[in-house]
């Protein structure tokens, strides 16, 4: 194929060299639209045809339009001799988004990324190429600014994020349109682009024209903000300015350091941890900020924030960020645990490493799950009142410890914390839980 405009090729070459990327196989997220069409053809040329076009059908538009787009994509790849793979979403995104309380846009993106990751592995490719351009970057920064993003967010869309690359971030929408026009290349126009159904469309169609009238050359200013924000984020990402104790399913912070540190850096660290666990998008700055309005310095232990994936608690002189484990394979248990011996549970393998009771000869304990709680109480009402103290804990993770049929301790298997003990009997205990069917 002969390119009448070499500008995009030059920028792609610069992008590859700047990020030290090899020229191995790439999965190109192809929608048939202008941006992904320009990306696909330019990468095909640049990588000597070592590309696979991947199309994901969300079916969030009408079936008629979706099928027309699929036919266009097939015809286009046939015309330019490009390998094509099509994946149709097997989930009703509209109804599922309503059930989960998330936007259609967010859920569609999630399933699309999952499909792309699968295609990457199945085809032995090195990268997934997305067609975000310079204008998308500007729109993203503006959206994040008005959503109260941290400086990390104002750095914009990353050009390289693990195996995801965006070679067109330095290419404007006008350059893309000129490239397609000069080469007489057709593309599919999504009918929703001109509608204000989604936030990005409203920013593009309504907000940006108003900003352009008032602030001439705002694009350069936003680009500068993005560059400075990225430098800031990279600098604070190099070293751990905040001491953190990391366990398998938790992060623990010293309370005094936590309170003395600038709130921005504390929040940034929490979001960084959540992002590494793949759940940052589910937590808003507002929710986190509200959590810290609690009188956190008071003596009483309390839960600051609780979600379906984790909870943030103040316990003694620590702030703990604790992730929930997979309950899918949970089964009730009732067994004897001896010091130095492993026992297999549905939640994992457990080891009693150390035990100190009022009687030195004690080396084993009766251990049972929450379902057996009533056998330690003659009165069920008293049992209910007693266990109401542990309402913040998930019952599936409570392990009851007994000696001579007397309840002497309760351990939260999610955190391995001793949440209650009969101190006159149980002095110290150390338990380890590994492997099993836990979510790694």
From Swiss-Prot:
CDD domains: TilS_N. Gene3D superfamilies: HUPs. InterPro entries: Rossmann-like_a/b/a_fold, TilS/TtcA_N, tRNA_Ile_lys_synt, tRNA_Ile_lys_synt_N. Pfam families: ATP_bind_3. GO terms for biological process: tRNA modification. Keywords: ATP-binding, Cytoplasm, Ligase, Nucleotide-binding, tRNA processing. GO terms for cellular component: cytoplasm. Coiled coil: none annotated. It is an enzyme of class 6 (ligase). ATP binds at residues 31-36. It catalyses: cytidine(34) in tRNA(Ile2) + L-lysine + ATP = lysidine(34) in tRNA(Ile2) + AMP + diphosphate + H(+). Its EC number is 6.3.4.19. Ligates lysine onto the cytidine present at position 34 of the AUA codon-specific tRNA(Ile) that contains the anticodon CAU, in an ATP-dependent manner. Cytidine is converted to lysidine, thus changing the amino acid specificity of the tRNA from methionine to isoleucine. Belongs to the tRNA(Ile)-lysidine synthase family. HAMAP family: tRNA_Ile_lys_synt. The N-terminal region contains the highly conserved SGGXDS motif, predicted to be a P-loop motif involved in ATP binding. This is tRNA(Ile)-lysidine synthase. It comes from Borreliella burgdorferi (strain ATCC 35210 / DSM 4680 / CIP 102532 / B31) (Borrelia burgdorferi).
């Amino acid at each position: 194929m002969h390119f009448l405009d070499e500008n995009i090729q030059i920028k792609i070459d610069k992008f590859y060299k700047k990020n030290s990327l090899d020229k191995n196989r790439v999965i190109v997220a192809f929608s048939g639209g202008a941006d992904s069409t320009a990306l696909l053809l330019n990468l095909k040329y640049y990588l000597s045809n070592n590309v696979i076009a991947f199309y994901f059908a969300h079916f969030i538009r009408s079936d008629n339009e979706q099928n027309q787009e699929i036919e266009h994509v097939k015809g286009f790849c046939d015309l330019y001799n490009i390998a094509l793979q099509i994946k149709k979403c097997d989930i009703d995104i509209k109804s599922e988004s309503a059930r989960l309380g998330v936007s259609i846009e967010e859920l569609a993106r999630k399933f699309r990324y999952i499909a792309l990751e699968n295609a990457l592995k199945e085809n032995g490719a090195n990268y997934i190429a997305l067609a975000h351009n310079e204008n998308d970057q500007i729109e993203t920064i503006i959206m994040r600014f008005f959503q109260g993003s941290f400086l990390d967010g104002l750095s914009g869309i990353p050009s390289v994020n693990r195996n995801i690359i965006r070679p067109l971030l330095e290419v404007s929408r006008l350059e893309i349109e000129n490239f397609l026009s000069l080469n007489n290349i057709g593309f599919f126009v999504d009918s929703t682009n001109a509608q204000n159904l989604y936030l990005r469309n409203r920013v593009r169609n309504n907000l940006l024209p108003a900003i352009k009238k008032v602030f001439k050359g705002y694009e350069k200013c936003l680009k500068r903000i993005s560059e400075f924000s990225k430098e800031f984020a990279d600098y604070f990402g190099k070293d751990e300015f905040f001491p953190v104790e990391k366990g398998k399913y938790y992060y623990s912070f010293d309370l005094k350091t936590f309170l003395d540190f600038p709130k921005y850096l504390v929040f940034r660290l929490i979001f960084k941890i959540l992002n590494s666990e793949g759940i940052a998008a589910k937590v808003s700055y507002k929710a986190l900020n509200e959590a810290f309005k609690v009188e956190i310095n008071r003596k009483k232990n309390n839960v600051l924030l609780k979600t379906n994936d984790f909870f943030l608690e103040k316990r003694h002189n620590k702030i703990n960020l604790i992730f929930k484990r997979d309950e899918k394979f949970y089964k009730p248990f009732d067994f004897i645990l001896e010091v130095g011996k492993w026992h297999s549970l549905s939640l994992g393998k457990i080891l009693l490493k150390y035990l100190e009771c009022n009687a030195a000869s004690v080396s084993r304990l009766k251990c049972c799950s929450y379902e057996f709680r009533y056998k330690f109480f003659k009165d069920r009402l008293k049992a209910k009142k007693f266990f109401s103290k542990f309402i913040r804990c998930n019952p599936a993770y409570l392990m009851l410890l007994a000696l001579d049929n007397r309840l002497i301790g309760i351990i939260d298997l999610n955190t391995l914390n001793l949440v209650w003990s009969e101190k006159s009997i149980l002095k110290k205990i150390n338990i380890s839980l590994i492997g099993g069917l836990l979510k790694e």
